[in-house]
Amino acid sequence: MSSGSTIVSSDKSGRTFKHEEELPKLPLPKLCDTLQRLKESLEPLYYADGYYQHPLDPEQIEKLSSIIRDFEENPVSEKLQSKLQSYHDTRDCYLDELHLDINNQTSTREIQDDVLPRNPFLVLADDALPNITQADRSAVLVHSAARFISALKQDLLPPDINATNGKPLSMAPFLNLFGTTRSPVFQRGEVENFDLNKPYTASDLEDPDYSSDEDDNDEPTQKDFDDRKRKHEEDIFTGNGITIKRHPDSKHILIISRGQYYTLEVLDSTNKIIYTAAELTTIFNHIIKDSSGIEKSTALGSLTSHSFRNWKYARKRLQKRYPNELHRIDSALFVLVLDESQEETTNDGDDTADISQMFNRTITERDKKCTSANCKRVFYGTSIINSKGHQVGSCVSRWYDKLQLVVTADAKATVIWDSFTCDGSVVLRFTSEIYTESVLRLARDVNAGDPQFSLWPNVTQMDPETKKLMTATISADGGGPSEIDPKLVVNKIDWSFSNILNTHVHLSETKLADLISKYDIVRASIPLGRRSAQRLGVKPDSMVQVALQIAHYALYGRMVFGLEPVSTRGFKNSRSSFINIQSQALLELCQLFISSSIDGTDKLDKFIQTCETHNNMVKHAKSGVGYEKHFNALKYLFKFHDHFGIHLSGDESSAAKDLFENPLVLPFSQPELIVANCGNAATTTFGITPAVPHGFGIGYIIKDDQVDLTVTSQFRQGDRLMFMLSWVLGEIRSYWRMSRGTSHNKTGVKISPVVDKLYEMDNAVNNPPKRNGHTVNGSRKTSSSSQVNLNRYGGFFDLEGHIDSRNISKTPSMKNLQKTFNGLTMSADNDHSSSAVSVPTEKEKLNTGHEILQIQPREVASNGLEADDETDIEIVAGNADGTSSSASSATSLNSKKRNVINSRFDIDFDRSRVGRKVATLDQ
């Protein structure tokens, strides 16, 4: 989900889905390759006891190898692979026929009540206007979102293009973004036969037999047995099923404020925008006021955060009792949440402000806690209990089954999405473009509403006269412009819950409050980013992923199974795939990194090699032959082999069960680390939730000079993990500096012997005697071999600078850049005290030449580090004999042209324009 993986086509006239048919099929990997990569991903987890360079456990590894080998040699593997091959030959994607959108409980087990909703979130940057209100920010973003949706529905949205190879990406995932919802799969008659008067019991969550309302005294017939068998088979296939419901004709949004539910039409029948941003502000202010006057709110949204079985039971009851209301929610384009929470601050008074200047570290820690608290409130809201014991926090104002846009009372905006229905790269584009459109509104305002200042200039508003008939009322004076009456255009959903449903809602709310109390979100920024990775010669994503594994190993002394999502939208009907982060090479690096068995240079080399291995894994997955989807498809076919018409013998079933249900393979379906990269300049924070209660969910955004990370965990040391990550990356940088410093005196760069000789000759003939820093006229020593200055760093040509120029150099500091340029600019002075010195003759030019300013190499300290790695280059005046004077003396009154090389050749050019090689930013 990297932010740099896609670009938007500049062809504004292009149709949104014009490339879909030309996309290639997702390849079907070879069975042997998938099993081999599965084995390699699991091996680093099983090693002998001990902390220092412990070897792999031979007994565990042999068991793992044996079960994989037995499965591969058994006919069951060929039967399952053949079924996938038949789907691959006859479908656009071999995964299409597997109904994975109905049953997604194969890749990860259902965790009972102990994990947060698996919804990633992106926090948007602040609005371009300071001190904007909640209603105004909501109106601007909703108006931008409506324009985005209108462009998509009218086929005006430019298609995505791969930034690396220029190939088109699938736009099909955009169809799952709006007007869709996550929903449990119900069997035939399950909702219709549900008894609303039946009290809620725990058995409702476990009993799959939904014919309990039948008369138990009736003697069952053969037909009853057949029906029950068929229902049982259906329940095996769909009992834990989750599917996606689509409503492509949706025109309205759902608004939640203080637990109250409202709907608002935003598109007309031709997908034109109904309201302006100003009109939306009026509507949202009305909703905020209306919801604030109601003391009792409903925590209905907390039902979407409950475990699968509780969620399914609640949806079934709501669908039976409130079918129309639930349909209005499910079919909404997206959800706007008007969160009433405010940002926490660190200032408790003037005393604290004074303390902050004296104790920066203490305040920094407090700021860090406040930043983490703000991440919590924009994600799952606040949990506040009033004097009556009722939940009045904003955590009840969420709906995790759908795409959500959350805007807090202090105008902080966040996009939260369901990872089952929505793709992360698609959400990132939506988030980025609605933010960009919100900024472009300022350009439209100062250009008389010019539509060219928009990402979608062809998207238009509804005709004013038509809108007047639909929504507006005449102002009080009868002659003024029409105004929107919010009461006429906003529809409020009224609930009248029974005691049974009230009980279930209450239990779901208390469970959610417990989860909020259990989980911690830590946000940290580490000052190494894209430029640092470029200097190392590695990909930024690989640098962060590998360093995180080292940090985890240094903290806990063991390797864990971790997954990273990789986009596969370059293929038909494909979204993403997971790759395993851990490998044998990474395990060896972790063991060596925390030891003293090798020096820093070798650790750096090993780190770079491991980053390259990780990058190759990413490329492999992007090519469509990743093993994660393939292995899950094989596992899914075996689980429902009867449904798919695959007949297996007892021996075949046993061989498959030994692999798919083996505890050694269990970490594959229960990853302890989920680490993902998603974000760009329009976002400030990206967070994901862990897959298991004891795991970490780590989201990060890579910037030029820093990495912003968000760690979500339950009873874990997220802040300490970030401390270890900072330490690891700091060590890597110090190793790089040390390696760079010691390489100054190495002949790692090949220079032509002829060029070397010319440098020596040029230095040899330029050692005239000096007096007070100036060449004495008419006096010149005869050069000889004993007088040749062979110091390659002491001559007037600095070879070290040329060697450095072949390496990627540090980006110059911007702090003193102007000062440096001013120092390099030479000015001629007309006050000459000696014509022999200030105005040399042509003969003198040939004999002695002119002096130039030299850019001397930075000194390397005894510890191998650069003496001043973060400051600008020091400017000194260099003479032919290797002596130097300060930059101030170099600009003395007796100098004529100080930018002429001290050579027998008269060469005049601006030396300040010559610098070291600058690192490019193309990563």
Swiss-Prot record:
Biased composition (Acidic residues): 204-219
Entry keyword Transferase: yes
A GO CC term assigned to this protein in UniProt: cytoplasm
UniProt superkingdom: Eukaryota
Compositional bias segments (type: Polar residues): 1-11, 774-787
Positions annotated to bind (R)-carnitine: S576
SUPFAM superfamilies cross-referenced by the UniProt entry: CoA-dependent acyltransferases (SSF52777)
Ribosomal protein in keyword set: no
Gene3D superfamilies cross-referenced by the UniProt entry: Chloramphenicol acetyltransferase-like domain (3.30.559.10), Choline/Carnitine o-acyltransferase (1.10.275.20), Choline/Carnitine o-acyltransferase, domain 2 (3.30.559.70)
Alphabetical GO biological process terms: alcohol metabolic process; carnitine metabolic process; fatty acid metabolic process
Biased composition range(s): Basic and acidic residues: 12-21, 220-232
Residue positions where N-acetylserine is found in the record: S2
Compartments, record wording: Cytoplasm
Chain positions with Phosphoserine modification: S783
Broadest EC class assigned to this enzyme: transferase
Function: Carnitine O-acetyltransferase involved in the shutteling of acetyl-CoA in the cell.
Any further remark recorded for this protein: Present with 319 molecules/cell in log phase SD medium.
Name of the featured protein: Carnitine O-acetyltransferase YAT2
